[in-house]
Amino acid sequence: MGQKVDPRGLRLGIVRDWDAKWYAGKKDFSNLLLEDVKIRDYIKSKLLAAGISRIHIERTANRVRIAIHTAKPGVVIGRGGTEVEVLRKELEKLTGRQISINIVEIKTPELDAQLVAENVAAQLQRRVAFRRAMKQAVGRAMKLGAKGIRISVAGRLAGAEIARTEWYSEGKVPLHTLRADIDYGFSEAKTTYGKIGVKVWIYRGEILPERAAREGGR
């Protein structure tokens, strides 16, 4: 099971929180879910160079609070906060709701699986050898404190006629251990030979769920 599913979804409510927090009845649920997708797609397309890993959305009545987790907060905020204000107004126009935006800086992007996947994909698009790109990403992550990392690339690697999957890993990535803090990221490299999928798993240590921690401290 742990080998097949997204490790983030498997750990929801255990060591990981939801990326969206709101409640809606049957009538409004699908519309609000679609609105979340539009918000995320718009922010990602607007801020391609900002290194955005995660977009957290909370809703209360007619107000939407958005937290953007980024490796380059300066790009999102802009000089004097102009860029983030423009983004806020555009999102209000898109949704018809009050929007507030909070920027969260990612201190070590080398330990963020989504950013690592996007970085490897960008290198593949620049025709960097896939083994070299994977090895460099793994080396940086391990150097900065990762307990383990696994990267897979799949597609027509190096222009081969037949698509295949290649892996590179270091350390351990315990996918079946639910208390393990495992981050997962996926990105695609669009090459002249077709798309190459990049998947990244990063194990950052164990997190003791709050209930177990409280009971252990008694």
Swiss-Prot record:
Is Ribonucleoprotein set as a keyword in this record?
yes
| CDD domains according to UniProt | KH-II_30S_S3
Taxonomic superkingdom: Bacteria
Kindly state which keywords UniProt assigns to this record, in alphabetical order. Answer: Ribonucleoprotein, Ribosomal protein, RNA-binding, rRNA-binding
Q: Which GO terms describe its cellular component?
A: cytosolic small ribosomal subunit
Pfam families (UniProt xref): KH_2, Ribosomal_S3_C
Which GO biological-process labels does this protein carry? translation
Q: Which GO terms describe its molecular function?
A: mRNA binding; rRNA binding; structural constituent of ribosome
The KH type-2 domain sits at 39-107
InterPro entries attached to this UniProt entry: KH_dom, KH_dom-like_a/b, KH_dom_type_2, KH_sf_prok-type, Ribosomal_S3_C_sf, Ribosomal_uS3_bac-typ, Ribosomal_uS3_C, Ribosomal_uS3_CS
Q: What HAMAP family does its record include?
A: Ribosomal_uS3_B (MF_01309_B)
Oligomeric and partner information: Part of the 30S ribosomal subunit. Forms a tight complex with proteins S10 and S14.
PANTHER family xrefs: 30S/40S RIBOSOMAL PROTEIN S3, SMALL RIBOSOMAL SUBUNIT PROTEIN US3C
Instruction: Sum up the protein's function in the record's words.
Output: Binds the lower part of the 30S subunit head. Binds mRNA in the 70S ribosome, positioning it for translation.
Q: Which NCBIfam families match?
A: rpsC_bact (TIGR01009)
Belongs to which family?
Belongs to the universal ribosomal protein uS3 family.
What name does this protein carry? Small ribosomal subunit protein uS3
Which species does the entry assign this protein to? Desulforudis audaxviator (strain MP104C)
